């Protein structure tokens, strides 16, 4: 209050590059979205989004990502981005009855999954192949920088295991104990050599939390390697070779890749390399050249400077 338009504009411009501002100001309803887009959404689109909201479908899009849209209708083709933000009639119709798109992602206590793997209780570890398993932490990594309409884990948003209520996703005290148990699964398996930390989105975890997760992975890799030194030839376990972080934030929220995060990635690479890990990868999902902005390019440069690779 009391600020001129120019003063407000300068203040928002100063906040724009802070990922916390972007998350705090994210659009969460159809009416907010239409207002942000200057009332450019059709009545059919608004009806569909309102129907989705009534069915409990979450909506979440940051000002940064929405700024990539063309609201004039006379500029460039932004259909690729709109397809990520706006839900299809088919998705809205089936929401509430969605099951796991991959049968292997169905985890039942005490029973092997469809790929034959017996997994720890809960929904933290998923596995389809002998050499790789997915880790989904009980942290803010169960959220995303936006909800992709094509998300393969839409059933997890449906069950609210994944959501955008950030305060409820902050790790509880018991998470540290649970993380140790989950690391035991990787350590005691003879074939696993690749861990993919995802969600949600791996980079949505707070820096302190992500550091703790990576340090737990590093300690596990070291223990597994030392145990192997005591095993005879022919009985050695696969050692951890690759660590991947699944994240769309370089496209959705590139300002999340700040200096502190880069230092965490660099420190982990140095420590994990000493215990035999050879590949460090951010696995992202750029879907259109419209997402390759100056901010995204800077985020990629920072990640590469930490010695990590980018795959898309």
Regions picked out by a protein language model, each given a short descriptive name:
Residues 1-129:
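Flexible, acidic/Gly-rich N-terminal and inter-domain linker regions that tether
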Residues 46-50, 195-199, 285:
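Glycine- and acidic
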Residues 61, 118-156:
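N-terminal pre-triad scaffold of radical SAM enzymes
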Residues 129-133, 147, 189-198, 243-246:
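Glycine-rich, often proline-containing surface loops adjacent to acidic residues and nearby aromatics
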Residues 141-144, 158, 202-204, 289:
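Short strand->helix junction
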Residues 143, 154-195, 212-215, 219-223:
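Conserved alpha-helical substructure of the radical SAM core
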Residues 146-150, 159-163, 294-296:
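A short secondary-structure junction signal
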Residues 179-187, 200-312:
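Conserved AdoMet/S-adenosylmethionine-binding subsite of the radical SAM
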């Amino acid at each position: 209050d009391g600020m001129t338009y120019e003063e407000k504009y300068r203040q928002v411009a100063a906040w724009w590059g802070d990922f916390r501002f972007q998350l705090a100001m994210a659009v969460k309803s159809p009416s907010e979205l239409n207002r942000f887009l200057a009332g450019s959404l059709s009545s059919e689109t608004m009806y569909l989004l309102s129907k989705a909201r009534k069915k409990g479908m979450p909506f979440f899009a940051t000002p940064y990502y929405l700024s990539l849209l063309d609201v004039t209708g006379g500029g460039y083709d932004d259909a690729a981005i709109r397809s990520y933000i706006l839900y299809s009639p088919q998705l809205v119709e089936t929401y509430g009855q969605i099951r796991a798109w991959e049968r292997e992602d169905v985890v039942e206590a005490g029973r092997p999954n469809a790929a034959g793997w017996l997994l720890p209780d809960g929904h933290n570890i998923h596995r389809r192949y002998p050499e790789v398993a997915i880790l989904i932490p009980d942290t803010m990594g169960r959220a995303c920088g936006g909800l992709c309409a094509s998300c393969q884990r839409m059933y997890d948003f449906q069950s609210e295991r994944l959501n955008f209520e950030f305060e409820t996703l902050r790790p509880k005290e018991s998470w540290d104990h649970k993380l140790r148990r989950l690391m035991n699964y990787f350590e005691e398996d003879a074939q696993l050599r690749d861990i993919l930390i995802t969600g949600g989105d791996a980079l949505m975890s707070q820096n302190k939390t992500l550091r703790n997760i990576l340090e737990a992975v590093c300690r596990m890799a070291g223990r597994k390697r030392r145990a192997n030194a005591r095993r005879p030839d022919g009985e050695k376990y696969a050692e951890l070779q690759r660590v991947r972080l699944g994240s769309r934030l370089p496209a959705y929220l590139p300002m999340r890749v700040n200096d502190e995060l880069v230092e965490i990635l660099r420190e982990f690479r140095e420590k994990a390399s000493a215990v035999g890990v050879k590949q460090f990868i951010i696995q992202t999902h750029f879907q259109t050249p419209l997402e390759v902005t100056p901010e995204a390019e800077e985020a990629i440069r920072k990640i590469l400077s930490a010695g990590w690779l980018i795959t898309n």
